[in-house]
């Protein structure tokens, strides 16, 4: 039975086929490698999908890790696997596999063994060395320098005097925002806050303050970056919008500064570092740094994984200025490691926390729900047939015995409210015809005002099934006519300056030719569908909550799993979905799974010590 553990992990999606081949490769390097130790290595690889970069080889925490992983995968009978893995840990403690496990790691060594054992924890080598780099570099770059808080009132008055807000007056910063501007003059910062707290706006004025006081940084490059191209472009657009709020006199006085910020390029972190896929290396690295005094603004820092962050930090010159922006409560990175969480926990003195949201009031129904605190007012669920779509917050109790029928009813109601008008209006669009800008804007607004989010990709309430159901609903109403549909890119299309996560609308003209509409900084652009590989486009009436990070919609319908011990039931996934909504959010769950999600926090074991 012991040798079936790896096959079981493969069957349940705990490891990939590539990871299984890696495990087989280990037996060629270490001839005496037994099945028990191989199962331990398999568990370590499987834990990476949970974001962990190490496991303890001490019996009690190891058994706990095994149990948690098996429950997450839905594997009920795993006692025989536990005994095998614990036995494997004992053999590794005794130093039995020196060809593949290094207990005295040296980053400069020509040959790196696949695994490292340190202080009772087993790491894949790449994560161990990334951890060491992050520990060293964070201590180098993030050191608190006390600021004079008495400057806050003057900072607020200055910003008010040089700006012209939408209502005619100047922009008034909150005290916490002004403090960030003052602190950024002399220290690197982690700026965290929820949606609408003004992280990018604060950074804009922070950069102005830095450049007014440091000619050497003004003369050096400014880099705007994020893990995704979509997030990076959105930050650049926000910076450009902030420039437009500057008064004429101030703009002329500090023209060089505002031109610098307006003209700064945006990058994905991979493109910023100069990723070379042929040899899986970066142009900028520990031996080839960015220019001295460069300034970096990195948005969506919660989505940065451990190894990418290590590569970024070791490419920086000592004179660099760094500002990391992110929301600590959002979902962490897809890949292993939770960089922002580690920094906020260990570097509180280098952190500015923005708490005042202008997207929604914290005392509003959505604002209260986002706190996920029901100690004073317990949440109330209603059956789907009592759903009030115009309520700001609704919790629908999905009866698992009638799941299919209730799900169909929910989707029919949603489509009738938000998608029927979209399809009717989109039918008036003629791809590539001039003089229909106003129509395109109206269609686009319908497309982006509401979205279905799901924690899962597959399953009855996963995005694949929901998209299929919505498409069938709309086609049945169209009586055989072609319908337009919302799509999303799942891969960067650099030649078009389109990115993974960008939303578009698929249209069909009178000749049956298909075109995709995207909204770019050049306005609306139609692209023939044939210019995209088929597997690059996904239907996106519904998208995963993870894909929705950084987006906002007026109305959100969110599905979370109905299996009580599902690994995607956690506070971060709830918070991320809820805070995408501006006007209303409906959550479809069971009271039990909603409670489980509220009480579960994603905790990643990386071993980082700062």
Identify the role of each PLM range:
Residues 75-153:
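Interdomain "pre-motor" coupling segment immediately N-terminal to P-loop NTPase/helicase cores
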Residues 329-487, 493-496:
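Conserved helicase motor core of P-loop NTPases
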Residues 117-194, 204, 210:
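Pre-Walker A segment
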Residues 1-76:
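Intrinsically disordered, low-complexity N-terminal extensions of AAA+/P-loop NTPases
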Residues 72-76, 80, 243-263, 424-442:
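Short mixed-charge
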Residues 178-181, 185-392:
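ASCE P-loop NTPase helicase motor core
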């Amino acid at each position: 039975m012991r040798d079936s553990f790896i096959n079981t992990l493969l069957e349940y999606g705990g490891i990939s086929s590539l990871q299984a081949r890696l495990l087989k490769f280990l037996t060629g390097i270490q001839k005496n490698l037994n099945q028990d130790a191989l199962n331990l290595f398999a568990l370590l690889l499987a834990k990476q999908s949970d974001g962990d970069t190490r496991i303890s080889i001490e019996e009690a925490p190891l058994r706990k890790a095994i149990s948690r992983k098996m429950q997450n995968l839905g594997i009920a009978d795993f006692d025989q696997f536990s005994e095998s893995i614990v036995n494997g840990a004992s053999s590794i403690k005794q130093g039995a596999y020196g060809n593949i496990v290094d207990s005295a790691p040296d980053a400069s060594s020509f040959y790196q063994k696949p695994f490292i054992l340190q202080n009772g924890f087993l790491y894949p080598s790449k994560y161990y060395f990334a951890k060491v780099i992050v520990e060293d570099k964070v201590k180098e770059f993030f050191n608190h320098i006390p600021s004079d808080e008495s400057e806050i009132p003057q900072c607020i008055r200055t910003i008010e005097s040089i700006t012209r807000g939408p209502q005619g007056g100047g922009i008034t910063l909150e005290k916490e925002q002004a403090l960030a501007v003052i602190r950024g003059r002399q220290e690197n910062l982690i700026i965290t806050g929820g949606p609408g707290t003004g992280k990018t706006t604060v950074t804009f004025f922070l950069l102005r303050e830095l450049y007014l006081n440091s000619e050497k940084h003004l003369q050096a490059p400014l880099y705007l970056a994020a893990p995704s191209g979509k997030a990076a472009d959105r930050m650049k657009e926000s910076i450009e919008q902030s420039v437009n709020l500057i008064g004429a006199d101030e703009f002329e006085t500090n023209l060089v500064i505002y031109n610098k910020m307006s003209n700064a390029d945006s990058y994905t972190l991979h493109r910023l570092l100069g990723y070379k896929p042929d040899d899986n290396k970066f142009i900028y690295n520990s031996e080839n740094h960015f220019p001295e005094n460069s300034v970096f603004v990195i948005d969506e820092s919660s989505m940065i994984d451990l190894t990418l962050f290590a590569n970024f930090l070791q490419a920086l010159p000592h004179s660099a200025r760094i500002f990391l922006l992110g929301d600590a409560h959002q979902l962490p990175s897809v890949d292993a490691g939770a960089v922002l969480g580690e920094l906020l926990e260990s570097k509180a003195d280098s952190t500015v926390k923005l708490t005042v949201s202008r997207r929604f009031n914290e005392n509003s129904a959505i604002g209260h729900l986002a706190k996920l605190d029901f100690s004073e007012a317990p949440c109330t669920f209603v059956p789907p047939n009592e759903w009030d779509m115009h309520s700001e917050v609704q919790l629908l109790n999905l009866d698992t015995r009638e799941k299919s029928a209730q799900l169909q009813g929910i989707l029919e109601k949603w489509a009738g409210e938000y998608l029927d008008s979209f399809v009717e209006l989109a039918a008036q669009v003629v791809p590539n015809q001039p003089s229909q800008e106003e129509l395109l804007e109206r269609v686009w607004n319908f497309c982006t005002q509401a979205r279905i989010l799901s924690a899962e990709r597959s399953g009855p309430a996963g995005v694949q099934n929901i998209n299929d159901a919505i498409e069938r609903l709309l086609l049945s109403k169209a009586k055989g006519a072609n319908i337009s549909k919302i799509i999303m890119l799942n891969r960067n299309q650099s030649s078009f300056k389109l990115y993974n996560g960008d939303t578009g609308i698929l249209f069909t003209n009178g000749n049956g030719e298909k075109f995709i509409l995207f909204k770019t900084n050049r306005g609306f652009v139609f692209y023939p569908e044939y210019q995209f590989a088929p597997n690059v486009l996904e239907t996106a009436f519904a998208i995963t909550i993870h894909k929705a990070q950084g987006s906002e919609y007026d109305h959100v319908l969110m599905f979370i799993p109905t299996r009580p011990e599902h690994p995607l039931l956690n506070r971060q996934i709830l918070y991320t979905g809820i805070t995408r909504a501006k006007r209303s959010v409906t959550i479809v769950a069971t009271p039990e799974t909603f409670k489980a999600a509220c009480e579960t926090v994603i905790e990643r074991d990386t071993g980082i010590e700062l």
